[in-house]
Curated annotation (Swiss-Prot):
Domain Histone-fold: 14-77
Comp. bias intervals (Basic and acidic residues): 98-108
Post-translational modification (record): Phosphorylation reduces DNA binding, but has no effect on heterodimerization and TBP binding.
Role according to the record: The association of the DR1/DRAP1 heterodimer with TBP results in a functional repression of both activated and basal transcription of class II genes. This interaction precludes the formation of a transcription-competent complex by inhibiting the association of TFIIA and/or TFIIB with TBP. Can bind to DNA on its own.
One GO CC term on file: RNA polymerase II transcription regulator complex
Name of the protein in its database record: Dr1-associated corepressor
Annotated GO biological process: negative regulation of transcription by RNA polymerase II; transcription by RNA polymerase II
Pfam families linked to this entry: CBFD_NFYB_HMF (PF00808)
The species this protein was found in: Rattus norvegicus (Rat)
The protein's assembly and partners: Heterodimer with DR1. Binds BTAF1.
Chain intervals with Pro residues compositional bias: 172-193
Similarity comment text for this entry: Belongs to the NC2 alpha/DRAP1 family.
Region of interest (Disordered), residue spans: 91-205
Length: 205
């Protein structure tokens, strides 16, 4: 049997919305249409927020949207003013990041050198800086799902890491030490072993 591919459903669940509404003691019964309308309103709101944030991300020549991009979008758009408290703790976009984008190939190298690790995917300079700002697993998974160009960009990352001398990680060879037991073994009793050796010789002959 062919496996059915699960259809991606991005709708906000009306049943969950209804439960959230009913947690308020002042709300009694909820008509069936109300959670559906709220679900659609949430979709439209999220669509407008993400479109604006996408514009900010693209203006920075970044491939991954980060919390810093969302923060800048919320601060720029007056209609999102009510979200400013949510992003107050998010670090601002660095002004130096814009200079790295105009430098071309120099940007990614500068972004990766301080504190880079072998796990990070390659990309533009802003991408590596954005990854430092956003440490969530979901954002890193999103980067692993990017197009094949990310796989090609990983190869330039190898030379900067290869420039670090690997000899520092090798430990000097230790001299061979035979295993010695911390407890002394008792010597075998000499009496019974002698007749057994004679018996074994009889079987051989």
């Amino acid at each position: 049997m062919p496996s059915k591919k699960k259809k991606y459903n991005a709708r906000f669940p009306p049943a969950r919305i209804k439960k959230i509404m009913q947690t308020d003691e002042e709300i009694g019964k909820v008509a069936a249409a109300v959670p559906v309308i709220i679900s659609r309103a949430l979709e439209l709101f999220l669509e407008s927020l993400l479109k604006k944030a996408c514009q900010v991300t693209q203006s920075r020549n970044a491939k991954t949207m980060t919390t810093s991009h969302l923060k800048q979008c919320i601060e720029l758009e007056q209609q999102f003013d009510f979200l400013k408290d949510l992003v107050a703790s998010v670090p601002d976009m660095q002004g130096d990041g814009e200079d790295n984008h105009t430098d071309g190939d120099k940007g990614p190298r500068r972004g990766r050198k301080p504190g880079s690790s072998g796990r990070k995917n390659g990309g533009t300079g802003s991408k590596s800086k954005d990854k430092k700002l956003s440490g969530t697993d979901s954002e890193q998974e999103d980067e692993s799902e990017d197009t094949d160009t990310d796989g090609e960009e990983e190869t330039p990352q190898a030379p900067p890491q290869a420039s670090h001398p690997p000899a520092h990680f090798q430990s000097p060879p230790t001299p061979f030490m035979p295993f010695t037991s911390p407890l002394p073994l008792p010597p075998a009793p000499p009496g019974p072993s002698a007749p057994e050796a004679e018996d074994e010789e009889d079987y051989d002959s």
